[in-house]
Amino acid sequence: MILMPMASVVAVAEPKWVSVWGRFLWMTLLSMALGSLLALLLPLGAVEEQCLAVLRGFHLLRSKLDRAQHVVTKCTSPSTELSVTSRDAGLLTVKTKASPAGKLEAKAALNQALEMKRQGKRGKAHKLFLHALKMDPGFVDALNELGIFSEEDKDIIQADYLYTRALTISPFHEKALINRDRTLPLVEEIDQRYFSVLDSKVRKVMSIPKGSSALRRVMEETYYHHIYHTVAIEGNTLTLAEIRHILETRYAVPGKSLEEQNEVIGMHAAMKYINSTLVSRIGSVTIDHMLEIHRRVLGYVDPVEAGRFRRTQVLVGHHIPPHPRDVEKQMQEFTQWLNSEDAMNLHPVEFAALAHYKLVYIHPFIDGNGRTSRLLMNLILMQAGYPPITIRKEQRSEYYHVLEVANEGDVRPFIRFIAKCTEVTLDTLLLATTEYSAALPEAQPNHSGFKETLPVRP
């Protein structure tokens, strides 16, 4: 593009009336013009080199950030430690960025909310708090004030979640730090008490005779329901009856997607592999075990990608998983954690939930990550004496929301969600064998008077 004017200058026809002096003057002017153009082009070349250097620098920085697993912003409790990379904190900042007009409206709404609260009009105040956060999701003062408001309503878990979210955005916010120091011990107490309730129910389930026909029937139904819900979460449209037909008869359902039916067969194969090979196995869970699970999950749908790590970058909602070249390294680190003493000392539900989250965070496969993560979670639960649990398709929105909250820095809502699913499974088994359901301990309401709710999206 730059050379085109030069070509046109050279191609100008010389007038016939030009004298020798005129020819000399013409050549002098042409030399000056070429010299000026070269003087202009040389800096442009330098600028181009600088641009390329900057791009190379960005590429190098991106690579370093992808590998910077130890440069972290931690948002943890002593019982549940999860590190979030600085890159992910940046993604959160981008996500919560509001327009200048939105920020002004958020501040006005917060001031009105505080005034309504002062006047005792708590219903209006709550709506205004939520409106402020809708206008500016990263408004730390609004998060902190809504946390105080929730704490006054004795919704300690919600308050602690809001303080934690504020600190994820602004780690040195003084008021949020003070408030979270107050709520954290209370929340840990609530969580541990809930785990104790689950342990009590597990002991009741384990006391049911293995030959119980009622238990056998409900476990069989649970098996079909688990496959139905875990593929439905991913968008599979087969009904429970159709899934039962496929697995019992080995015949395809006419008029239905063969790919969806192969997803069901793959889940069935993966669950058989876990039940027959891994549950009773003594020893570490390895990368090969996870690859074998995935090979069965995806093997009937995409045999080329089944059982192998992805080779392309993917985007999952607001989350950017690790670069493909870092997947194997992160899976090795994940496996080390999976078999570490720290992980083994966690409560089984907490351990299983964290394993699920960490695997889906890495997103090591091109497809089938959610199904594989849920299977790994159930493997850990079964090895600890818990029954496999089911996340129902009706819970899909809540499930994805708490995963997103975990990506933002607080994994505890996801752990509580898995704990709630675990309790539903245990209650189902106990109620199906009614003689063992007497005097079940209740997790809610708890004796402290605190509400035990999952955080809601403002």
UniProtKB/Swiss-Prot annotation:
GO molecular function per UniProt: AMPylase activity; ATP binding; Hsp70 protein binding; identical protein binding; protein adenylylhydrolase activity; protein homodimerization activity; protein-folding chaperone binding
Positions of TPR repeats: 106-139, 140-173
Catalytic activity: L-tyrosyl-[protein] + ATP = O-(5'-adenylyl)-L-tyrosyl-[protein] + diphosphate; 3-O-(5'-adenylyl)-L-threonyl-[protein] + H2O = L-threonyl-[protein] + AMP + H(+); L-threonyl-[protein] + ATP = 3-O-(5'-adenylyl)-L-threonyl-[protein] + diphosphate
This enzyme's EC code(s): 2.7.7.108, 3.1.4.-
Predominant location: endoplasmic reticulum
Residues noted as binding ATP in the record, renumbered to the chain: 234, 316-319, 367-374, 399-400, 407
PTM text: Auto-AMPylated in vitro.
Cofactor: binding details: Divalent metal cation. Prefers Mn(2+) over Mg(2+).
GO biological process: protein adenylylation; protein deadenylylation; regulation of IRE1-mediated unfolded protein response; response to endoplasmic reticulum stress; response to unfolded protein
Cytoplasmic domain ranges by topology: 1-23
Entry keyword ATP-binding: yes
Record InterPro entries: Fido, Fido-like_dom_sf, Fido_containing, TPR-like_helical_dom_sf
Gene3D superfamilies in the record: Fido-like domain, Tetratricopeptide repeat domain
Family: Belongs to the fic family.
Domain notes: The fido domain mediates the adenylyltransferase activity.
Record protein name field: Protein adenylyltransferase FICD
